[in-house]
Amino acid sequence: MASRLTLICLPHAGGSASFYRSWAALLPPEVELLGVRYPGREDRFEDPMIDSMGRLVTALADALVPLLDGPYALFGHSMGSAVAWELAHELDHRGAPGPRRLFASGRAAPGTAVTGELHRQGDDTLCAELQRLGGTSREVLDDPGLRSLILGMVRNDYRLIETYRPAHRPPLHCPIHVLTGITDPELGEERIRDRAAGWADLTTARTEVRTFPGDHFYLTPQRREVVATVLRRMDPSLTTGGRTWPSTP
């Protein structure tokens, strides 16, 4: 392989860079993991949260453009999939190199995903939604301090994704790989492939749909197989290994 690859990972609503921390141990030295940390969480807790897709993508592009000195791929989960798609277009608009591949996990294509108004609902409704999707333990939601902290981030991000209306854009030119859990309640088991396949209209290159056992957060128990799949698509010569990981400011 001629140069090192960077895997840029964008989290789900309420998530942050640490969601991908465990991936570092599965990556070979040829791949650098760059976890995106949205403002208002972890060591960016003092930074104001952003509840607009346009402003978030602008801020991410500002941080990432100086770092794009080689081939890279974008991986987004749930809300992060839409952020990754918008980010690819914003980077192209700035004349930056485009991603080698885009991995869209756990979300229908922009413009086809079902939106709602959960960000306007009470805390109990938001907690019920988090339990429905999985990925958040009952113990965390039962702790008043942790619950308040998490719901603040979740409500902000739900406002972002529920008010997001993608503009009509030309297709990307990189392959799009769609990954999803076979029982993901966000997509619906009976129509999961049809909804995931909507990404095919957003690129001139090929699109692949890959399903895994599990629900919306399938990629936690299926972490090893997900990472192996990503590596094979990035470069067939890559195998799992391990290294440390940085994250964006």
Annotate each PLM feature.
Residues 1-75, 82-249:
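Domain-scale detector for complete catalytic domains at protein termini or as standalone homologs
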